[in-house]
Design a protein with these regions (language model features):
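Acidic, contiguous internal or C-terminal segments within carbohydrate-active enzymes
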Residues: 144-191
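Beta-strand-rich recognition/accessory modules
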Residues: 201-243
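Surface beta-strand/loop "capping" patches
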Residues: 28-65
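Short aromatic-acidic-glycine turn motif
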Residues: 84, 184-201
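Acidic-aromatic substrate-binding/catalytic surfaces of carbohydrate-active enzymes
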Residues: 63-145, 153-154
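Short, exposed beta-strand/loop patches in secreted or surface proteins that constitute
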Residues: 43-45, 52, 130-143, 157-161, ...
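Short, structured interface segments
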Residues: 13-37
């Protein structure tokens, strides 16, 4: 890898510089943290396990595909008003922990046998759900936005990540929702789930997640944590906590 880096440098494809120089360039070009995305649709063994990260200064989300099954593995909102533990004093341990405000946390809320996530489901006549297999995604970058489209048999599924919001649409004749499930026994931050907002508290910090389009429904039987129901076939989640 070092040989290849040197070769690319000599060819003008790679610039070698110090972190100070990189930081100065970044600050000059981006006064505010820009939106970024990272896509990896095959794992190291070329298995059809894919992951897409989208990050802005307001939130981050991770979308996972395991074969043809999709889930939001991670949706965390950022609040610049919350000071990190290391803002005014140095860290003295061997690890640093930076807290963000979760709507979905596939790492902390999962177990070896149950993967937490927000999944696309069809609502059955008895109120139960069936996960819809979305198939593999088509990915398009459009300015600061990321647009993801899937074509399951049940309709057209679209996710649009913008800097301040998540937009999800499913053009289908099925009754559908996004359904959050977690492993049993996990401590969740949600204090109150109402139609248009979730009141939550994490690490001593209260926050609210609002649905600009669609509504939240809490489970009444423990089969899931909550559902986000669409309005006119779409859901919009406001990811700006500073409003």
């Amino acid at each position: 890898m070092l040989f290849r880096s040197a070769q690319w440098r000599n060819e003008g494809r790679l610039r070698v510089e110090t972190l100070t120089e990189s930081g100065r360039w970044f600050k000059q070009n981006f006064p505010l943290t820009p939106a970024t995305a990272v896509t990896a649709m095959l794992d190291q063994n070329d298995n059809p396990v894919g992951s897409i990260w989208y990050n802005s200064r307001f939130y981050r989300t991770n979308m996972m595909w395991t074969h043809n099954e999709f889930r939001f593995r991670d949706i965390h909102l950022f609040d610049q008003r919350i000071e990190s533990d290391y803002l005014k004093k140095a860290g003295t341990s061997t690890q640093c922990i930076y807290m963000t405000m979760p709507l979905v946390d596939g790492y902390m809320w999962s177990s070896n046998s149950a993967w937490a996530g927000l999944r696309l489901v069809e609502i059955q006549s008895d109120g139960s759900s069936r996960q819809i297999k979305t198939g593999r995604p088509e990915i398009e970058e459009k300015g600061s936005e990321l647009i993801i489209k899937c074509h399951p048999a049940e309709g057209e599924f679209t996710i649009r990540c913008t800097e301040q919001a998540l937009y999800i649409a499913f053009d289908s004749d099925k009754q559908w929702a996004l359904e959050l499930t977690t492993a049993t026994g996990k401590q969740l931050p949600f204090n109150q789930i109402s139609i248009d907002a979730i009141k939550a508290e994490f690490n001593g910090h209260p926050y609210s997640i609002e649905a600009v389009r669609g509504n939240f429904v809490a489970s009444d039987n423990g089969a899931y944590v909550l559902r986000i129901m669409p309005s006119d076939s779409a859901i919009t989640i406001d990811c700006n906590l500073s409003r």
